[in-house]
């Protein structure tokens, strides 16, 4: 089991940490996780930031790896101004979190070993 905490750094003219802004504007953001070809279960951490609608933002999570031979990918998206969110949405691809509407601010895929 691994505990993950996301930190959003923006680099352009100056280095800028946007994590605080995301926390302050928690109701305007939501994070989804989608493992691919990896036997991983992602849970939103008990100490994660909670939006006013009762949904956890996703900045803090717990990753349970079910196989020692797990090699795959994890896709993480930060959605800005979604019209609705569901933190408990599981799908056939083991995605955690679902949104309707909004814009994708961040869309990254990382290797999982």
How would you label these PLM feature ranges?
Residues 1-113:
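First exposed extracellular module after export/assembly in secreted or surface-exposed proteins
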